[in-house]
Amino acid sequence: MRIHLIAVGERMPAWVNAAYAEYANRLPAECSLNLKEIPAVKRGKNADLARIAETEGARMLEAIPKDCLVVALDEKGRSFSTAELSRRLDDWMHSGRDLALLVGGPEGLTDACRARADLVWSLSPLTFPHPLVRVILAEQVYRAWSLLRGHPYHRE
């Protein structure tokens, strides 16, 4: 299964790219994590933030590969323990379909993105900077996979 992390924003700080790559590169081909960056719309002083969110949301939806399961990351979504996420990952891997994870920009996800999702997932009730979400997601996917495979990375 390929996991497509579709995220708004390009040109992340070096530490974000390094941390994301650290975990993404640990995953095997059976559960590969690939980043698709969606260019953020420029925000000016009097920017129409609703229009910007709609534009970015439409670009995200266009980037979803055909026949993917779609999981939208949103603070109002469902939260999972590590064990629950590991079971979900196992189900997704056995579905025979790829997975798309949607991470919005500063304005969050649009209603259309949430409606397209098969699941809306909340990493935490806290608000995280969007670049950091990439790192957290990569680490949590790796942790869930390592738990499935009995790898010593995750400890109860």
Curated annotation (Swiss-Prot):
Domain of life of the source: Bacteria
Sum up the protein's function in the record's words. Specifically methylates the pseudouridine at position 1915 (m3Psi1915) in 23S rRNA.
* Single annotated GO MF: rRNA (pseudouridine-N3-)-methyltransferase activity
The reaction(s) this protein catalyses: pseudouridine(1915) in 23S rRNA + S-adenosyl-L-methionine = N(3)-methylpseudouridine(1915) in 23S rRNA + S-adenosyl-L-homocysteine + H(+)
Which InterPro entries does this chain map to?
Alpha/beta_knot_MTases (IPR029028), RlmH-like (IPR003742), tRNA_m1G_MTases_N (IPR029026)
The EC number of this protein is 2.1.1.177
Got a GO cellular component term for this one?
cytoplasm
Where in or outside the cell?
Answer: Cytoplasm
Q: Does the keyword rRNA processing apply?
A: yes
Lineage, highest ranks first: Bacteria, Pseudomonadati, Pseudomonadota, Gammaproteobacteria, Chromatiales
Q: Which PANTHER family match?
A: METHYLTRANSFERASE, RIBOSOMAL RNA LARGE SUBUNIT METHYLTRANSFERASE H
Task: Report keywords, A-Z.
Answer: Cytoplasm, Methyltransferase, rRNA processing, S-adenosyl-L-methionine, Transferase
Residues that hold S-adenosyl-L-methionine according to the record: 73, 104, 123-128
Q: What class of enzyme is it?
A: transferase
Would you tell me the protein name for this molecule? Answer: Ribosomal RNA large subunit methyltransferase H
Stated family: Belongs to the RNA methyltransferase RlmH family.
Task: Give the matching Gene3D superfamilies.
Answer: 3.40.1280.10
**Assembly information from the UniProt record:** Homodimer.
Q: Name one Pfam family in it.
A: SPOUT_MTase
HAMAP family named in the record: 23SrRNA_methyltr_H (MF_00658)
